[in-house]
Amino acid sequence: MARILVGLSGGVDSSVAAALLVEQGHDVVGAYMKNWVNDEGIPGECPWEQDIQDALAVAKTTGIEFRVIDLVDEYRARIVNYLIEGYRAGYTPNPDVLCNREMKFGVFLDYALEQGFDYVATGHYARRMDTPQGAFILRGRDPNKDQSYFLSLMRPDQIARAVFPLGDLLKPEVRVLAEKYGLPTARKKDSQGICFIGQVKMSDFLRHYLPDKPGNIVDTEGRTLGTHNGLHLFTMGQRKGHGVASPREGVAYVVVGKDVRRNRLILGYEDASTRGLYASRAVVGGISNTLAPLPARVMAQPRYRAKAEWASCEYLEEGKVRLGFDTPLRALAVGQVCAFYDGGKLLGGGFFESIEP
């Protein structure tokens, strides 16, 4: 049996993960990663104190040791700064994906290894498979909860130390197990929002760090349609919130681009022919592969819950590929994470660096 440090978030998924590992006979210790404290007056609830109490109650119920690990400084340096600077530059960051590589299976894993643990376990709906060539990640059994996308930037050495007890379970089965084990989180609602920041709205979070920067809203021909308060408040494909009514009945205006240099938000019609809305090619960099270089044909998933689409894959240089999508993809954004699959097998992931029509 292994010595495993399980990340207890105070939610039902990590609670059941811990209970399963105890039932399997492992030497389990639970730890809450204290990554964020909303002490700067940002609107919204960040219930970390209640989450700690819930995690502690789970540890008592399962009979395991419980620790609170203060990672606030590391989280700010690795995740919050990445998020703020990405939006400042006009990108669309994905803190939840980076959080897994840098925090849960980065700083937290380093702590675990220093403390003599063999593995780190989380409540992700994903599976790990070991082969003679190394370990890789498979999609979770539950197609509605599969979270392998969020693990797509993990390095091979991190995957080898990861345990996902919920990978073969459906979400309803997890709820049933939580009741069976008598866990105090059995009926707790799933959390939403930015990784570890709770119910804080992204717009409120960004406004706290990035002051309004008014600019013009234009159409694809450069005609002025209105004004905006900051490019960081908008994302590609966004239909609402820009305040511009479409002159075409039944066809909405959507965000199709950002001109960062001139601080202009570009709108176009929700139409396949609109320049900038659909992409047939893209360059992906910062690639983290699990086992081997990407093949010439891959399935590319551009965001969580999006369908993975077939694409040609050409290496440009180390860590960068150009994708050619069989079917043009809607509203891709620089900075988003693209995950690569071979069926249900996760091959790795990277960041969109440029988008081509």
Swiss-Prot record:
Interaction with tRNA, as annotated region: 145-147, 303-304
Top-level taxon in the UniProt lineage: Bacteria
Gene Ontology biological process: tRNA wobble position uridine thiolation
Site location (Interaction with tRNA): H124, Q336
Pfam families to which the protein is assigned, alphabetical: tRNA_Me_trans (PF03054), tRNA_Me_trans_C (PF20258), tRNA_Me_trans_M (PF20259)
UniProt keyword tRNA processing present: yes
Annotated positions binding ATP: G7, L8, S9, G10, G11, V12, D13, S14, M33, G123
Keywords carried by this UniProt record: ATP-binding, Cytoplasm, Disulfide bond, Nucleotide-binding, RNA-binding, Transferase, tRNA processing, tRNA-binding
Interaction with target base in tRNA: annotated span: 94-96
Reactions accelerated catalytically: S-sulfanyl-L-cysteinyl-[protein] + uridine(34) in tRNA + AH2 + ATP = 2-thiouridine(34) in tRNA + L-cysteinyl-[protein] + A + AMP + diphosphate + H(+)
Phosphoprotein in keyword set: no
Signal peptide: none
GO CC terms: cytoplasm
Catalytic residues identified in the record: C99 (nucleophile), C195 (cysteine persulfide intermediate)
Single GO term (MF): tRNA-uridine 2-sulfurtransferase activity
Disulfide bond positions: C99-C195
EC number(s) given by UniProt: 2.8.1.13
Subcellular location: Cytoplasm
Record-linked NCBIfam families: PRK00143.1, trmU
Family in the record: Belongs to the MnmA/TRMU family.
Known role: Catalyzes the 2-thiolation of uridine at the wobble position (U34) of tRNA, leading to the formation of s(2)U34.
Name of the protein in its database record: tRNA-specific 2-thiouridylase MnmA
Lineage per the UniProt record: Bacteria, Pseudomonadati, Verrucomicrobiota, Verrucomicrobiia, Verrucomicrobiales
